[in-house]
A protein has these predicted regions:
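Catalytic Walker B motif of ABC-type/P-loop ATPase nucleotide-binding domains
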Residues: 178-182
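Helix-to-loop junction immediately C-terminal to a conserved catalytic motif
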Residues: 68
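Conserved ABC ATPase "signature" region
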Residues: 116, 131-149
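The feature captures the beta-strand-to-loop junction immediately N-terminal to the Walker
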Residues: 53-55
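H-loop/switch region of ABC-family ATPase nucleotide-binding domains
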Residues: 214-215
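Conserved ABC ATPase signature
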Residues: 153-157
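Conserved ABC transporter NBD signature motif
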Residues: 75-83
Length: 232
């Protein structure tokens, strides 16, 4: 599904492509007493898409959650050059967005209202949006080819369509770093490639640092700029 044509300004611009989006230095992850990752170093630049591959239970979700600030790790994680540990909750919310692997269908909200949730870090305490916020919501729907679904509800949509709406919500959050946990998990093969192609385009054209976990080796090797293997 191609993106719609819509030209609206972004609220702000992120780091230039090629600068570090995610930096890991001596990172160690554990689940209970089991070490999942030990002394790992990696740099993922802006304007790139990287696939995280590995068997079930090797710590892919744990790593993504740690980078999002939702889990614990030793070592250092930097987002756009800044230590994750030094970021406030609001700073983190404007730096990294996270699309989980859960099937989320919000039946009583229109899709544009779901996408508008991504603007929460930028609105006032009652969540009132300005015109710039509404423009970004519209542009986010356009970028994922879902403008015509703006007033529809997710309970009447396919898994692939729902996943696009959740990606649009992450885009509306307007963060330079986007993490996705198994975004192609519930999709058939054609839709897996279509979604991965969309993520690649968003990385290259919007300058995002996109890091996602997947079991689809063909997608990872064929459409991504780099792959990261986690194997314990």
């Amino acid at each position: 599904m191609a993106a719609d044509t819509l030209h609206t300004p972004r609220l702000h611009t992120g780091p230039a492509p090629g600068t570090p989006g995610i930096s890991l230095h001596g990172l160690t992850l554990a689940y209970g007493r089991r070490v999942l990752l030990r002394d790992a170093d990696a740099v993922l630049p802006q304007g790139s898409i990287t696939a995280l591959i590995g068997r079930n239970g090797t710590g892919k979700s744990t790593l993504l959650r740690a980078i999002a600030g939702l889990g614990t790790a030793t070592g250092e994680i930097r987002l756009c050059g800044k230590p994750l540990a030094a970021l406030t909750a609001l700073q983190r919310a404007s730096t990294v967005s996270f699309v989980t692997t859960d099937k989320i269908r919000i039946a009583n909200l229109a899709c544009e209202d779901v996408v508008a949730l991504g603007r929460a870090p930028y609105t006032n305490w009652i969540g009132r949006m300005q015109q710039a916020d509404r423009d970004i919501v519209s542009r986010s729907l356009s970028l994922v080819g879902m403008s015509s679904f703006a007033r529809k509800t997710m309970d009447r949509m396919s898994d692939g369509e729902c996943q696009r709406i959740l990606i649009a919500r992450a885009l509306a959050q307007d963060t330079p770093v986007i993490l996705l946990d198994e975004p192609t998990a519930f999709l058939d093969l054609p839709n897996r490639y279509e979604l991965a192609s969309l993520l690649r385009r968003l990385a290259h054209e919007e300058g995002k640092c996109i890091f996602f976990s997947t079991h689809d080796l063909d997608v990872a090797l064929g459409l991504c700029d780099a792959t990261a293997l986690i194997d314990t």
